[in-house]
C-alpha cells in the first residue's frame, strides 16, 4: 500500500467518490457532495493524498495544520471491498507516523457519532475521545448529526506498520 500526493489527474476518481452517497453518508452527505472535477481541484491544493493498493486507488486521506504542532486529519476507504481488512488502520499508521516525524506533536480528528467502526480504529491507534458534540450540525437532508472529537499524542501512538 502507498499514500501519494493528490494530482489533478486523480480528480475524476475523487469526484466520483465524493458524489457517491454510499461513500459519503458517514460524513453526513447521504446523497454525495454534488461537486465537479474542477471544484475538487480548486478545493484540494494542499494536504490531500490518495491511498493505493496493488496499483488501484482505494481511498483518500488528508491533513491540515490547525495550530502550532497540531494536525487535523481525515480518511476514507472508498472502495467497499477494501473496508474491514485493516487497510484504514495501516494507512492511518503511515500518515500519522509521517506527521509525527515531520514535527507535529498532536493529531486531531472528528467522526460521526454513529460511525463506531471508525471510532474502534481510532482508539486502537491510541486516540483519546476528547468531546462528544450532540446534534451539533445538520446534514444535507436537514437531519441533526452528532460527532466525536479525538486527539492523539505521539507518546500514545500505536502503529500498525
Locations of the language-model features?
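Active-site acidic-Proline motif in GNAT/NAT acetyltransferases
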Residues: 79-85, 113-114
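Acetyl-CoA-dependent GNAT
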Residues: 27-82, 92, 98, 153-157, ...
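A short beta-loop-alpha structural element at the N-terminal edge
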Residues: 1-16
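Conserved catalytic-core motifs of GNAT/GCN5-like acyltransferases
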Residues: 108-110, 128-145
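Conserved acetyl-CoA-binding loop-helix of GNAT-fold acetyltransferases
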Residues: 84-101, 119-124
